[in-house]
């Protein structure tokens, strides 16, 4: 479809909902905002223009139609969680600039990369180590891990689009992408979608999920998947090359090229560790996670690891500010205007007598496998989280459990297609894995991941007293 067709469909969806009859329990301005919000989501999916532009269209439409005021329209930009992810994206630029991420990766490969399976675990550890401070999994996967995977593959004469792709490149690309989707489960600050979920949850239910609560819910399924997935993929989609002694030599050459560890790397490493400690101990220090992230950014600037020009040029952070501020603001207003509550009550009445825990299993599976219809995790969260979460809460599910459950379910769907998340086209686009194979292997990974995340996450929440 061309731009005009996609834009026309977006507007058409909004107009249809606008003029549909609705219950008197929803005020006209609430219904009109729902129409605009839905059209904005459709715009995110069809993308006649970039996400940030579609978000601005949503704000303008809501204000022009007097569905909300200008102050209300901009209220989402004052949300602390929105600024948390923006600040964390800026901090991740300091990690990339310093070269610390590459040094960690090549050090692990030099030490443990004697086989293709061990190489996969070394790459997994790299992603895990840097994920708490890189909330853009696209930047983490595409900017740090992917180039390393590509270099390793080419070093073993594993070329894309040919007979040599299966030598090692296809396996490493698949595994690195899968791990990138798993680390987002463990740390709240490892993915923008996580903070979108907690922001929407806070707006709808008035409950703020802490960094530590997220870690408690995600660490058990996350660690299980981190250990299991490289081996599982090795079994269902094995590389032709099993032993890789040359990898250590290649890694040493890369480390030699990087030279001795720099002051910038040391300072970023110290700041990185301190930020994680402060996030993890916020329950005692009372420091808001957003303040901690901003402290990390300022520390990077003071130590010279980051400049104001770097911050101004970090397009991902500013883009997130625009679209996430819009979504969080609109979702909060839909809650205040009673739209979400009316919908949740209607659905829960039709599910009366159905146990909320088993309903959460079914709704979680629906949430995960709906990813086939969305071109990003963000679009799926935006479209489904508020409604699905409200239904579960109306059925009796605890609010913290509900919010964290959807956080856990953000991961399994990201392996399903070659367009499931922002980082997916980078690994798929390398040309090592055919589309049909990507979908087939991705489905197998997703099923295992879903079961581990649901049952492991539920056990973790029970173990730590959240459930």
Give residue ranges: language-model regions.
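Membrane-embedded alpha-helical segments and adjacent helix-loop junctions characteristic
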Residues: 22, 52-162, 314, 318-320, ...
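Structural signature of hydrophobic alpha-helical transmembrane segments
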Residues: 25-35, 79-90, 287-297, 347-359, ...
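Hydrophobic alpha-helical transmembrane segments
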Residues: 7-8, 33-34, 38, 52-56, ...
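Generic alpha-helical transmembrane segments of integral inner-membrane proteins
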Residues: 8-16, 38-42, 60, 64, ...
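Juxtamembrane and boundary regions of transmembrane helices in multi-pass small-molecule transporters
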Residues: 1-19, 100, 137-141, 156-259, ...
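Interfacial loop-to-helix junctions that mark the boundaries of transmembrane helices
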Residues: 1-2, 24-32, 44, 71-80, ...
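Transmembrane alpha-helix interface/packing and boundary motifs in multi-pass membrane proteins
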Residues: 41-50, 126-136, 177-188, 278-284, ...
